[in-house]
Amino acid sequence: GERYLTDREVAELLRVSRRTLQEYRNNRVLPFILLGGKVLYPETGLRGVLEANYRKPLE
């Protein structure tokens, strides 16, 4: 099944602050689920965003 990550896990993974994650949520940059006041991020959704924004290095 789907794996869901917490704010802390995603902040560590992306090396950003939890406040930056809040901005990403506000601007709908990252997919998330709000469940009972807790924010969770689907791992496959995060991977999709990262892959969609991947830029190849210049040669």
Task: Please annotate each region the language model reported.
Residues 1-19, 23, 52:
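Polyanion-binding surface elements
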Residues 3, 28, 39:
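Flexible coil/turn residues that form the inter-helical turn or adjacent wing/linker of helix-turn-helix
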Residues 14, 30-31:
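Extended rod-forming repeat segments used as scaffolds/tethers
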Residues 28-29, 53:
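The DNA-recognition helices of helix-turn-helix-type DNA-binding domains
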Residues 33-39:
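Short Lys/Arg-enriched helix C-cap and helix-to-coil transition segments
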Residues 45-59:
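A short, Lys/Arg-enriched interface patch at domain edges and termini
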